[in-house]
Amino acid sequence: MAEFKHITVLLNEAVDGLNIKPDGTYVDCTLGGGGHSGLILSKLSENGKLYSFDQDITAINFNKDKFEEENELGKINFIKSNFRNISEELNKRNILGVDGILYDLGVSSPQFDNADRGFSYNYDAPLDMRMDQSQSLTARDVVNDWSYEQLVRIFFRYGEEKFAKSIARRIEKVRQQTPIETTGQLVDLIKEAIPAKARRKGGHPAKKTFQAIRIAVNDELGALEESLEQALDLLNPGGRISVITFQSLEDRLVKVMFKQKTSLPELPPGLPVIPDSQKVEYKLITRKPIVPSEDEITHNNRAHSAKLRIIEKL
């Protein structure tokens, strides 16, 4: 069994937030190391069902071994797919409604810690960053083939990098001489593009650029938005969605979508009764996001930026 070590963040809070019914049908959109799936399974009866998605075959294979007995009993079903295909994949299995859906977003620890995957600026590795290894677009393609304007846009939008233009300009200059093949090369040229004073504060100088490229390679925000829209429609009455985010762009997207779904639309003044078609179908369970305890952050530093938001279908 291939190792897939990952400390699950906000484990109990996210699963408890789903208000699990023992005979219910649930979806874990981000299987990873199986932490959330395992806790959901422990709360299900023999009639309960869990459908666990991951686009990384390493995670699927690891969990097929880990949950071999539950898999044979049909309690857990593994789906190798991007969670943007949630409706299509569940429809194939004649699942038209579910009681809860969980998302634990971002890159899992094994993906970060496996140097060959090219997610981390701490290792020198081929520029890859694909969550789905069968996908054709890689970080190398983005860095070497995308235009200066495209690079500036993703560095600003997905990395919130204020030195986006100088980094993109440096990339453009270097790649005209020789292809940029590795994370180490990319880190070096990012450092060259950022003023020395700025490099000394605010964490690793390549962090924001690497985040931006990773989001672009995997279309993470597009996939999340599409998936959440479908997930909200899939919920049975009383069903809930728990979403754990790790960076501000994801959290903002979830916050805005949940607010829209739980707010009344603008109506003409003086209407005596709100029409049924205009009534709110969802309610927020978390007015403010749930964040990890100091103790959890002490034991798992990667938890420090996590935020959990929960919504329920009425």
Swiss-Prot record:
Location of the protein in the cell: Cytoplasm
Transmembrane segments: none
E.C. no: 2.1.1.199
Disulfide bond recorded as keyword: no
CC terms in the record's Gene Ontology section: cytoplasm
Top EC class for this record: transferase
Lineage: superkingdom: Bacteria
Keywords: Cytoplasm, Methyltransferase, rRNA processing, S-adenosyl-L-methionine, Transferase
InterPro entries associated with the record: RsmH, SAM-dep_MeTrfase_MraW_recog, SAM-dependent_MTases_sf
Pfam family, one: Methyltransf_5
An annotated Gene Ontology molecular function: rRNA (cytosine-N4-)-methyltransferase activity
Protein name in UniProt: Ribosomal RNA small subunit methyltransferase H
Species annotation: Ligilactobacillus salivarius (strain UCC118)
